[in-house]
Each structure stands twice: as structure tokens, then as C-alpha cells.
Regions:
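Bacterial Sec-dependent N-terminal signal peptides
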Residues: 1-24
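Cell-envelope and extracellular/periplasmic
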Residues: 22-473
Length: 473
């Protein structure tokens, strides 16, 4: 009997040992992914605690790391120069998992709210101009791929989420971000390496939706408790913290080249006066999260839209704050849009001209990150104002070889001491200067340009880029 009891205890002891588990990878590490070229790219996952994990890339020798007591492991591996040669990686902790069809290239995150989320097929009653041509071209963009991160909220930061990489073609392009698609297509034309797009965005979100708990606690009065968040923001897409936890946090270990960002519309009516500070915090946060202190951040000016009152200036204030961020944060560039909305789109918050936005972002990246240093990529902007009796002389910068001539320049206004603005007659004098006058203002003191919720501009530099909105008072 005693011997029998010992046998039972012996077999029970095996049941208490941890089961041998197949190594687990986050969903974003999968077949057909694009790895950032010539980088110490981070690979990570889960395995049996304290076990060795062997990583064997097809382009180099094996590497070994050890899972910690919770089964987590990570390792940085040097990736090859970008090419269209398919690669593979095998992971093993006794049982092998192999990823196939990997490419090395350039990886960019497409972040923000609905104008970045807007797919190539458009939204309901919101088409994307040039859709059919874009779909026809999709299969010819060699090595372009994307992964759509599910837009979900989470009370705590998520380490993984269900997703997979899509190979760009006519059947898959419909669901790719339109801005991301046109960005990737133009960049691919210029640098001829595979392009990977990580789509981590959610329509309707505020900048606070992407800030982490530490930043929200230290620099805002926003709630961080889920119940309090839901009480203050019944509309879920406006909720702070939760979208970043659920939709952005799962990608933070992935090695990337930069971020393109299109957001700000939801902040026109929510916390507008703190937008510049909070966007700056977000840029700093993401650079810290990706462990890349100078990570490129190229973002899009919110496009003209009425917001219920076309002549109001709330949206113009956000645009000015976007410029403040571009001027004060290193390696951040703002893309102008006041020329990319049709007059009939005053009530359309999702304007259809997405190609030009994506291409302007791509030209910015090409100039700043890929050696095309002769490209004109900056929009002209206000430099200084001189007032002489009834005339205002507005000096601009980044005009390059001058301003594109048109019959009548629209969007300028001037005001006197009473700060009542009137449309100005604008005369282009030379390379970077406009003369503004108005019969209604004898002694002007202030000038502004495109400073309404919905105001289209037609002042462009020789690169075809629009003058950014400004005001001098």
C-alpha cells in the first residue's frame, strides 16, 4: 500500500510541472510582415518561463535569449538592407515556429482619427477622389504591405491584439488608409524598397485619446479611471487613454522609421486651448515608447470644414497650434491642406482629396529621411508684418522661387484698432511679399489669412504648397 501511494505521488508530480508550450508571438509578428531595414529590430513573445529561445533568421546566424520568470522574452536582431527577396525567421524553444514571406523595407505608422482611418474605398457618402486608378495601381506596387490594428479600447495597456499583414493588391487595397496608401505609393516610387504601413488609428478621437496615464495625470485634468472616463465622455470615441491602451500600445515594440499623423478635428470642440501642449506631449511620449528620441513625425493640418459655423475661428485656432508644434518640436513637419477642399465640401468633414495629402507627406519624408535634399517640401508661412499708413506688407518664408500667380488672391483680411476684420485686396509684389489694403481700414494694425473654420486659400509657393493660415494679433 505504501509503495502504491509513492507511485501515485510520483505521477502527480509530473502533472504539476509546467506543460511544454509552443512559443507564442504577438500577432503583428507574422507571415508577410515588413521589418524596418538596416535596424536593430526588436522581436518578442512568450515561452515557458526560464527556457531558452533560439532565433534563426534566414539572412544570418542564430541567436539565443532566455524567457524571464513570466515567460516574456525579447531580442534585437540586425535586419538586412531593403529588398524584394523573401525572408524567414524561425523561433524555437524546443518546438519551432517559422514566419515566411518577410520583407525588409521602410515601416511607417499611420496614426490619428477618421481622416487617417478613411480607407481607400471611402466612407459612406464620402468617396476618395481617384479611387479607381488607385485600385488599378495597387497590384503594381511591389512589396507594399499594411497591417490594420483593430480599434479597441482597454482600461490597461494591451501587449497584443489580433491582426495580420496584408499584401497590397487590388483585392486588399480597399481597406488600407487612403492617406497611408498614397503616402506609401509615392515613397515607394522614390526609394524602390518595400513599404510597410501600420494603421493604428480611430475616427473621432481627441489627442487625449492617445496620451498615456502618466501624461494625463501630470499635465491634464482628464480622468484615468474607466468608470469616470465613461461618465464624462458618453460618446466612446472621445474617451482619453483607452484608445491608446487598446489600439496603439500593442505596436510599441515594433521597429519603425516614422509616424504620419492626421488628427485635430475632435479637439476643435474639446480642450482646444491646450492642443499644442498636449500634441507635443504625445510626440514626446511616442518617441520615448519607440525608443527613438528623434523619430520623424509628419502631420496634417486639419482641413477646412464649417463645424456648424463656417465663419467661426475655432478650427483656425487649432491650425495655428499645429504650426506652433511644428515650429517648437524637432523633426516635426506640418502639411498644409487649405487648397485641398472643394467649395461644395464645407459640410464634409472627410474631404475627398487624399492623394495630395499622402504625397505631400511622402515628399517630406523623401526630403528629410531619404536623401532627396533638393525637394521643396515646406509650405510657405508668415514671417513678419510691416505697416505703412494704410498699407500692410506681409513677408513670407519658404516661398522658394516665388508665389504662383493667380488673378485674385483670396483669404487675406486686415483690421484696425477695433479688431474688426475686412477682406483685403492682396497684391503680390515680389518673391516673398504681399501688399494688403482695404477701403474699410484706414489705419491697419493686424492681418490674418485663412482664419475661419471654412476658408479656402489660393496662395501657393513654386512647389505648389499652400500658405499656412496665420494671424498677427
Amino acid at each position: 500500500m505504501k509503495k502504491f501511494c509513492y507511485l501515485i505521488l510520483y505521477f502527480l508530480s509530473f502533472l504539476c510541472l509546467p506543460a511544454s508550450a509552443k512559443i507564442r508571438l504577438p500577432h503583428i509578428l507574422c507571415d508577410n510582415m515588413v521589418l524596418q531595414q538596416q535596424a536593430d529590430a526588436r522581436l518578442w513573445g512568450w515561452a515557458t518561463p526560464r527556457t531558452r529561445v533560439i532565433i534563426k533568421p534566414s539572412w544570418g546566424p542564430s541567436h539565443t535569449t532566455v524567457a524571464d520568470k513570466e515567460g516574456r522574452w525579447s531580442f534585437r536582431i540586425r535586419t538586412p538592407k531593403g529588398s524584394y527577396t523573401p525572408l524567414s525567421i524561425t523561433f524555437s524553444d524546443g518546438e519551432a515556429v517559422t514566419l515566411h514571406g518577410i520583407l525588409a523595407g521602410e515601416v511607417w505608422v499611420c496614426a490619428g482619427q477618421s481622416n487617417m482611418e478613411m480607407p481607400l474605398q471611402g466612407f459612406y457618402e464620402c468617396p476618395v477622389e481617384g479611387y479607381q486608378d488607385a485600385i488599378a495601381d495597387a497590384g503594381r506596387i511591389r512589396g507594399m504591405r499594411y497591417v490594420k490594428i483593430p480599434a479597441v479600447m482597454s482600461a490597461t495597456p494591451k501587449d497584443d491584439t489580433v491582426c495580420h499583414w496584408e499584401v497590397m493588391n487590388a483585392n486588399t487595397a480597399n481597406y488600407c488608409s487612403a492617406v497611408g496608401y498614397f503616402f506609401g505609393r509615392r515613397l515607394h516610387e522614390m526609394i524602390d524598397v518595400p513599404i510597410g504601413l501600420i494603421l493604428a488609428n480611430k475616427g473621432g478621437t481627441m489627442v487625449e485619446s492617445w496620451l498615456n496615464e502618466d501624461n494625463l495625470k501630470c499635465y491634464t485634468n482628464e480622468p484615468v479611471d474607466s468608470a469616470e472616463i465613461a461618465e464624462r465622455y458618453p460618446t466612446d470615441w472621445l474617451r482619453p487613454l483607452l484608445w491608446g491602451n487598446g489600439t496603439f500600445h500593442p505596436i510599441l515594440n515594433y521597429s519603425i522609421r516614422g509616424i504620419i499623423y492626421y488628427q485635430g478635428c475632435s479637439n476643435v470642440d474639446h480642450n482646444p486651448n491646450t492642443y499644442a501642449e498636449r500634441l507635443s506631449r504625445l510626440i514626446s511620449q511616442w518617441r520615448s515608447d519607440f525608443k527613438a528620441p528623434n523619430l520623424p513625425f509628419y502631420f496634417v493640418e486639419i482641413a477646412p470644414y464649417s463645424y456648424g459655423n463656417a465663419l467661426d475661428t475655432a478650427a483656425a485656432s487649432i491650425r495655428m497650434q499645429q504650426q506652433t508644434v511644428a515650429e517648437s518640436v524637432g523633426n516635426a513637419v506640418l502639411i498644409g491642406t487649405n487648397d485641398l477642399v472643394y467649395p461644395v465640401e464645407a459640410e464634409q468633414i472627410h474631404p475627398c482629396q487624399k492623394r495630395q495629402i499622402g504625397e505631400r507627406l511622402a515628399m517630406t519624408a523623401a526630403a528629410r529621411d531619404y536623401g532627396f535634399d533638393q525637394i521643396f517640401y515646406r509650405s510657405p508661412s508668415f514671417e513678419k508684418l510691416e505697416v505703412r499708413r494704410d498699407s500692410c506688407f506681409v513677408h513670407l518664408k519658404d516661398t522658394y522661387n516665388g508665389i504662383v500667380p493667380v488673378t485674385s488672391y483670396e483669404g487675406f483680411e486686415i483690421a484696425g484698432q477695433d479688431k474688426v476684420y475686412y477682406p483685403a485686396h492682396a497684391q503680390y509684389i515680389h518673391n516673398s511679399t504681399f501688399l494688403l489694403t482695404s477701403p474699410n481700414v484706414a489705419r491697419p494694425v493686424a492681418v490674418r489669412y485663412c482664419y475661419h473654420n471654412f476658408q479656402l486659400g489660393n496662395v501657393k509657393n513654386q512647389a505648389g504648397l499652400p500658405l499656412l493660415p496665420f494671424k498677427t494679433d
